[in-house]
């Protein structure tokens, strides 16, 4: 109670001393009085700062603290400032740092209270020193609070000292804005008591330290002003410093972000030149498109520079066209083979090499083990590089050859031949061969010069192939043929007889064919072709009814067509016989280049193939070219026979539209239909017509195609 009274008295005197001017130093007596006042009120000196940190001190304490601190309690550890203003500002800041943390441990109260420097006055309803609180009023408020604090001071002093020592090393946590918020929150009386006791003990320690140093002499007015302006300002400065630090950090972060953004923009700007402008890009894209197209045209659309072409496979597609051309030419150049041009496919996996001569081409084909960029290349003659029409125009058909003839022997006769292909069956030569030349002119020249030449004891017969040969057949003219038939049809032939057997009998025959069934057995008849009508007529007269292998044969002239298979006028449809039972319509169609569809005649009851069918083309020219190419060819291992299909209306058995029982020509169905016997068609029971009805259905009359006629043998 005595201390509180003294404190109140001191504050009253402080009020009276406010008017005098600022004084830096006073008499020694005044210093002693100030020290005595510090003794009486020293306990409250640190209270406001403790309160500021704890937000639990009363306003009176806070006012006294700031005054006493400013007047007589300079910070012992810190340097005393010369000017009172600086001292006042410095002292509370330093004091605020240490006690603020000291209270945090024992009290363990809310963080908001500990952080607020100006929070205390709000609790008691008193105005804070920053707002110009009067010392007299604060002293009165202090009396009511101090009564409860005196009893507990001594008991808690030891604990508080330990707490203070521990807490002095902890950094202060000061937030100006948080202090304002904490000022609004009320604190309990128990908290005030504990904190007051701690502050009193701290004040005593500060008094001892202040005696050793020189006391600052400040007038009461100065002391009064100090709490109002200095303490909150200092608190504000600390908070502002923290805010400034935060703002600086934020500014630094923003600066870093801006720098990153600038770097990204710079990178984008650097990348932008790489991306072409829309117009430029469009041009480049056009160029990119044009290059492959030009390359493609060069490879696929270009004609070979020479007729001596070589196919090369298994190239390295990872290399460029230029690299491949150089690498492909090198191995041939090392072998003294002149390469005219090298063409590669668009995928660069294959290519073609054009040579100057057929000799170079043949030598190139003999080379083995050639490697290009590590890949062993495949060498062979190109397949289908030239159209069959072009190849047929420069190809001759050689007949009446010895069955023992070889390609080398023919090569000696036809020296300028580009390719020679012997026709064989079951590994045995059939006595015919196809001889291809460089050009159509060379083929014509050889036909004139080598016609009838003797090869291995036999006179060879040469014929044109392709369209030129078809025209000659229609006109009945060929190099050695007359308008008369040069083919004999031989019937009642022994099933064991072979073409070799017949060749021994008919020595002048240029072509002999013995048709076989699906099992490879003879059908009992044959076609024998001669070089001239006179030879055919002579054979007919001398060999008719001759016995061959136990059977008497019958001979007759086939007709003026000059070919065993040319028994009717050309059309858009080919008749194919001798098919295997396993042959499908798809296989049949694929066997004839240029065909549009194919159909195989099957048995109505069993559904099995009858061994023949029809192949349609878009034009007669396509049909002729296909017929010539497949002459004496094989399908699924069976040798097939080709003929022109009969035009509509000429066949019996209802043509394609009628069923087998109709006999009604074109329109008859199975029930007889319109025609009766013969109907509208020319033939009666003859003709090869469609036995099954075909596309026209059972009712007949559909969009049927013409068929060939049936050859009848006695």
Curated annotation (Swiss-Prot):
Keywords: Acetylation, Cytoplasm, DNA-binding, Isopeptide bond, Methylation, Nucleus, Phosphoprotein, Repeat, RNA-binding, Ubl conjugation. Residues 57-134 are annotated as: 8 X 8 AA tandem repeats of X-T-P-X-K-K-X-X. Residues 1-303, 642-714 are annotated as: Disordered. The modification Phosphoserine is found at residues 28, 34, 40-41, 66, 144, 157, 188, 302, 357, 402, 459, 461, 563, 580, 591, 619. The modification N6-acetyllysine is found at residues 9, 15-16, 95, 101, 108, 115, 123, 319, 349, 378, 399, 428, 445, 468, 477, 513, 521, 572, 577, 646. There is a cross-link at residues 298, 325, 371, 378, 513, 577, 589, 624 (Glycyl lysine isopeptide (Lys-Gly) (interchain with G-Cter in SUMO2)). It holds the Pfam family RRM_1. Residues 285-301 have a biased composition (Basic and acidic residues). Sequence repeats lie at residues 57-64, 74-81, 82-89, 90-97, 98-103, 104-111, 119-126, 127-134. InterPro entries: Euk_RNA-bind_prot, Nucleolin_RRM1, Nucleolin_RRM2, Nucleolin_RRM3, Nucleolin_RRM4, Nucleotide-bd_a/b_plait_sf, RBD_domain_sf, RRM_dom. Its main location: nucleus. It comes from the Eukaryota. The modification Omega-N-methylarginine is found at residue 695. This is Nucleolin. The gene is NCL.
């Amino acid at each position: 109670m005595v201390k509180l009274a003294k404190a109140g008295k001191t504050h009253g005197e402080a009020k009276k001393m406010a008017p005098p001017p600022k004084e830096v130093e006073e008499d020694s007596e005044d210093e002693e009085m100030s020290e005595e006042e510090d003794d009486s009120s020293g306990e409250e000196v640190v209270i406001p700062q403790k309160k500021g940190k704890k937000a639990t001190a009363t306003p009176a304490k806070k006012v006294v603290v700031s005054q006493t601190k400013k007047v007589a309690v300079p910070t012992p550890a810190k340097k005393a400032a010369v000017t009172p203003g600086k001292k006042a500002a410095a002292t509370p800041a330093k004091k605020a740092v240490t006690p603020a943390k000291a209270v945090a441990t024992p009290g363990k109260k809310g963080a908001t209270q500990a952080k607020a420097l100006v929070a205390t006055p709000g609790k008691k309803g008193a105005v804070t020193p920053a707002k110009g609180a009067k010392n007299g009023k604060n002293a009165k408020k202090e009396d009511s609070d101090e009564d409860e604090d005196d009893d507990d001071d001594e008991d808690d002093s030891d604990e508080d000292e330990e707490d203070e020592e521990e807490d002095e090393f902890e950094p202060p946590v000061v937030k100006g804005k948080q202090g304002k918020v904490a000022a609004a929150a009320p604190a309990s009386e128990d908290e005030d008591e504990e904190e007051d006791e701690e502050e009193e003990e701290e004040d005593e320690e500060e008094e001892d330290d202040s005696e050793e140093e020189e006391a600052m002499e400040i007038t009461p007015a100065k002391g009064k002003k100090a709490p109002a302006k200095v303490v909150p300002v200092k608190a504000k400065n600390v908070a502002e410093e923290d805010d400034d630090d935060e703002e600086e950090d934020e500014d630094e972060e923003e600066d870093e972000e801006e720098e990153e953004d600038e770097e990204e923009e710079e990178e984008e700007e650097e990348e932008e030149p790489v991306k072409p402008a829309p117009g430029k890009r469009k041009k480049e894209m056009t160029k990119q498109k044009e290059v492959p197209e030009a390359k493609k045209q060069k490879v696929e659309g270009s004609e070979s520079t020479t007729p001596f072409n070589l196919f090369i496979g298994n190239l390295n597609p990872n290399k460029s066209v230029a690299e491949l051309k150089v690498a492909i030419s090198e191995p041939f150049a090392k072998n003294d083979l002149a390469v005219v041009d090298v063409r590669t496919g668009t995928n660069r996996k294959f290519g073609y090499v054009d040579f100057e001569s057929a000799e170079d081409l043949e030598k190139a084909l003999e080379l083995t083990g050639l490697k290009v960029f590590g890949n062993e290349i495949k060498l062979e003659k190109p397949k289908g590089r030239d159209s069959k029409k072009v190849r047929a125009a420069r190809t001759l058909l050689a007949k009446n050859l010895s069955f023992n003839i070889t390609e080398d022997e023919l090569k000696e006769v036809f020296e300028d031949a580009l390719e020679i292909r012997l026709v064989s069956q079951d590994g045995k030569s059939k006595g015919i061969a196809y001889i291809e030349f460089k050009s159509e002119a060379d083929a014509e020249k050889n036909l004139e010069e080598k016609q009838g030449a003797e090869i291995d004891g036999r006179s060879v017969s040469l014929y044109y192939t392709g369209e030129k040969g078809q025209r000659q057949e229609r006109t009945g003219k060929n190099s050695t043929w007359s308008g008369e038939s040069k083919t004999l049809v031989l019937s009642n032939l022994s099933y064991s007889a072979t073409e070799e057997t017949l060749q021994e009998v008919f020595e002048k025959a240029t072509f002999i064919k013995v048709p076989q069934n699906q099992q490879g057995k003879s059908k009992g008849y044959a076609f024998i072709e001669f070089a001239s009508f006179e030879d055919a007529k002579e054979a007919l007269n001398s060999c008719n009814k001759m016995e061959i292998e136990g059977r008497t044969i019958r001979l007759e002239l086939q007709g003026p067509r000059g070919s065993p298979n040319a028994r009717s006028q050309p059309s858009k449809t080919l008749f194919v016989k001798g098919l295997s039972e396993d042959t499908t319509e798809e296989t049949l169609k694929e066997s004839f280049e240029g065909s549009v569809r194919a159909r195989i005649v099957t048995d109505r009851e069993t559904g099995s193939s009858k061994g023949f069918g029809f192949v349609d083309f878009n034009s007669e020219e396509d049909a002729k070219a296909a017929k010539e190419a497949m002459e004496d060819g094989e399908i699924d291992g069976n040798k097939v026979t080709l003929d022109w299909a009969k035009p509509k209306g000429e066949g019996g058995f209802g043509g394609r539209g009628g069923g087998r029982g109709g006999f009604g020509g074109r329109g008859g169905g199975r029930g007889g239909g319109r025609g009766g016997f013969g109907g509208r068609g020319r033939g009666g029971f003859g003709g090869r017509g469609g036995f099954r009805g075909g596309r026209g259905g059972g009712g007949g009359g559909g969009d049927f195609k013409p068929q060939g006629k049936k050859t009848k043998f006695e």
